[in-house]
Design a protein with these regions (language model features):
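Short acidic/polar hinge/loop motifs at secondary-structure boundaries
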Residues: 107, 114-140
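Gram-negative outer-membrane beta-barrel transporters
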Residues: 343-345, 350, 413, 417, ...
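A beta-strand signature from Gram-negative outer-membrane beta-barrel systems
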Residues: 128-171
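Conserved C-terminal beta-signal and adjacent last beta-strands/turns
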Residues: 187, 243, 469, 505, ...
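Transmembrane beta-barrel wall of Gram-negative outer-membrane proteins
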Residues: 167, 174-209, 214-252, 276-293, ...
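Surface-exposed extracellular loop regions of Gram-negative outer-membrane beta-barrel proteins
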Residues: 248-262, 366-368, 373, 427-434, ...
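Membrane-embedded beta-barrel scaffold of Gram-negative outer-membrane proteins
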Residues: 194, 287-291, 297-315, 460, ...
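Face-selective signature of the C-terminal outer-membrane beta-barrel domain
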Residues: 237-245, 278-435, 458-460, 518-522, ...
Length: 705
């Protein structure tokens, strides 16, 4: 039995060529494709740490609300559900991104080739529509440097491509804490996609609501996703992309250790200040692909979007008294656009197969950032949770222009070289329109640039066993959010914050075992000028500083195995030792301390019986070691182990398919912390996870045959 999984753009311009050797190595065993080039390159033959989770696995017996549900099988990826839809998931890769108080940091993310990461490096998972995902592709290690402003890795989400026959599917899920999801999806195609005029389409929409596990954590989320492909002629294709999300979420905030132990569901400051957040995002893209000759291809992606955010925070009136204080309400409107174009040429050099990809990536974002007081005075007393007087008004511009070159060279039948370089240029320009007595003009600008090389040698010990060694230099600038606040309540942008640079070395092994794949990687990353949290006050406001030197080193193991026709086993183990190599604490010596927000050990195993129809069942076990909450390592979230079980039944009759399932998570009702807010100044580090919780769901689909 052959299992094919595809990893398309943007990985297509990471490893752009399909080598004859890679095609010859494919057998009837499991094959994972990691480029969109003709013929593809199997995951076995990719000289990098790449993991693929297909959409069916993401949706299998799952709520289909968050990426954290079914990505545990990816080693090196620490993804945690905050139980807080106002702050997004907490996601880090090999320790990069762990400092983020909201959104995703240190990782480049894409939806169908459109960046879900802004030019400054701030990303979001909130617009990912799990209902229509074909695959989630995760790249870790040195080659992530070739994507520019990201150090930890790359996540690419790919939408399903419609096929014949047309299909319509409706699904629903009901879970604990008043959680409900409805979804509707339609897909199809005319023709087989190879002739002029052939069209494929996928359209999906979802609605999710929840009261939330914690007090003051209710949320509503409405994502939508669409993809339309048109074959212009035998050599070219045009793809239209659309994506949107509308979120309204309360923010329960963090708890102290005592508050967590007393009542993990409480939200004392959420109720007092009515902390909440609304987000609206809409984006569209256009991708043109053309084969110029048998050896030359071009691809152009253009996109534009808008993201609006309004957040109410938990700050007292007195805290906002200083003229330089930006208030307790954040009001943002971001417009972003970009274009990525590349040309790929396949040829021979010294009679050896070689491929070159030359590209240029341009991204631009303008941000209107305003701050308001989070109260109105009623009879002289503050009424919190209301938008008050203006306290901040600025326009921030960010853009980058990055040329890049990549090559793959088959040196011998067994030895190949992959290498590339990117020149990353990033500009920030801030214009301050809120100039009043006590708050001067804080306008300013900054420019960051860096050469980012990466390379890898791969050697095929056998047709089923490859080893590789790789190196890359990463580059991570401060985001505009990290520049937005200075410590000790000082006004203006924190332009003293410098970008961090990292050097990563990795050795790895990939072995095909029957109808499965066993992968292993050892890595070390040394970083200069690491950007870390200086102080975090209240809900969603943090200031940052450079921490000198840090080191991340570890081991990743993963097994994806299928037995017979329906038995599946997945396992992943990550050991990550992330420490400061210089002192970063204001008092005391933190040299040698563990970096906060990062688990040293993570283990995931799942085993299940999943036939195409009939009864199915499975279970998973997740372990995460303790996580330090601050630089001083004086507080931490304890380690935990959770168990989940699921079962369901698939019934097919004619063109109809019905899938009904149920699941229980945290089977043994473990009390644990799901995530931490790093360096929270009031000790409110902890974001509790729910105890034992349940869910039932169903989907029904019809094929028009």
């Amino acid at each position: 039995m052959k299992i094919s999984r595809a990893v398309y753009a943007p990985f297509a311009f990471l490893l752009p060529v399909a080598l004859t050797h890679a095609q010859a190595a494919a057998t009837d065993e499991q094959t994972m494709i990691v480029t969109a080039a003709p013929g593809g390159i199997s995951e076995l033959d990719t000289p990098a740490s790449v993991s693929v989770v297909n959409g069916d696995d993401l949706r299998h017996a799952a709520p289909q609300v968050n990426l954290s549900e079914n990505l545990g099988s990816v080693p090196g990826l620490q993804i945690q559900n905050r139980q807080n839809f106002a702050q997004d998931l907490q996601l880090s890769m090999r320790g990069f991104g762990s400092r983020s108080t909201y959104g995703v940091r240190g990782i480049r993310m894409y939806v169908d080739g459109i960046p879900a990461t802004m030019p400054d490096g701030q990303g979001y998972t909130s617009n990912f529509d799990l209902n229509s995902i074909e695959s989630v592709d995760v790249l870790r290690g040195p080659f992530s440097a070739l994507y520019g402003n990201a150090s930890g890795g790359v996540i690419n989400v790919k939408t399903e491509t419609g096929e014949q026959p047309a299909k319509i599917e409706a699904g629903t899920w009901y879970g604990s804490y008043g959680s409900v999801r409805y979804g509707l999806k339609a897909s199809g195609a005319t023709g087989d996609g190879t002739q002029a005029g052939d069209v494929d389409y996928t359209v999906s929409t979802t609605r999710f609501t929840t009261h939330g596990y914690r007090d003051h954590s209710g949320a509503r989320k409405n994502p939508a996703n669409a993809k339309l492909g048109v074959r212009l002629d035998e050599a070219s294709k045009l793809t239209l992309l659309f994506n949107s999300v509308d979120i309204k979420a309360n923010d329960p905030g963090g708890l102290t250790r005592d508050e967590w132990r007393e009542n993990p569901r409480q939200s004392p400051r959420g109720d007092e200040f009515n902390t909440r957040k609304t987000t609206k995002q809409t984006q569209a893209g256009l991708r043109y692909e053309r084969a110029l000759t048998e050896n030359d291809d071009i691809s152009v992606m253009a996109y534009a979007g808008e993201r609006e955010t309004r957040q109410f925070q938990s700050f007292k009136q007195g805290f906002q008294a200083a003229p330089s204080n930006p208030g307790g309400v954040i009001d943002l409107t971001r417009h972003y656009q970009g274009i990525d174009s590349r040309w790929t040429h396949r040829d021979a050099l010294l009679s050896l197969p070689v491929s070159f990809t030359l590209g240029l990536d341009y991204e631009n974002m303008s941000e209107d950032r305003k701050g308001f007081e989070n109260y109105r005075l009623i009879n002289g007393a503050p009424q919190y949770g209301e938008k008050g007087n203006l306290r901040r008004n600025e326009r921030n511009l960010m853009w980058n222009v990055d040329p890049y070159l990549q090559t793959t060279w088959q040196l011998t039948d067994k030895l190949s070289l992959d290498a590339g370089v990117r020149y990353s240029n990033i500009w920030f320009d801030s214009n301050d329109f809120y100039v009043v007595p006590g708050n001067g003009d804080d306008s300013g600008e900054a420019n960051y640039h860096k050469w980012l090389p990466a390379g890898s040698l791969k050697y095929a010990l056998t047709d089923a066993w490859n080893v590789y060694a790789s190196y890359g230099r990463g580059f991570e600038t401060p985001t505009i959010n990290e520049l937005s606040y200075r410590s000790n309540g000082q006004s203006g942008l924190n332009f003293a914050l410098k970008p961090s640079t990292s050097d990563t070395v990795e050795i790895g092994s990939k072995t095909r075992i029957g109808n499965g794949l066993l992968t292993a990687a050892l890595f070390r990353t040394d970083t200069d000028n690491e950007i870390v949290v200086d102080e975090s006050v209240g809900s969603g406001r943090s200031s940052y500083k450079n921490a000198g030197k840090t080191r991340r080193q570890g081991v990743e193991l993963a097994l994806d195995q299928q037995f017979g026709d329906a038995w599946k086993l997945k396992a992943a183990w990550t050991y990550l030792d992330a420490t400061y190599r210089t002192n970063v604490c204001r008092t005391g010596d933190c040299n040698g301390n563990r970096m906060p927000g990062i688990a040293r050990n993570m283990l995931y195993t799942s085993f299940g019986y999943e036939p195409e129809t009939g009864w199915y069942a499975g279970g998973d076990v997740r372990y995460m070691s303790s996580i330090m909450a601050n630089d001083a390592n004086t507080d931490k979230a304890p380690s935990y182990t959770t168990v989940g079980l699921n079962t369901g039944y698939k019934f097919q009759r004619g063109n109809w398919l019905l899938d009904v399932f149920g699941r229980v998570d945290n089977l043994f009702d473990k009390s644990y912390v799901g995530s931490v807010i790093v360096n929270e100044s009031n000790g409110r580090y902890y974001e509790p996870a729910p105890g034992r919780n349940y869910g039932v769901g169903a989907s029904v689909s019809y094929r028009f045959e």
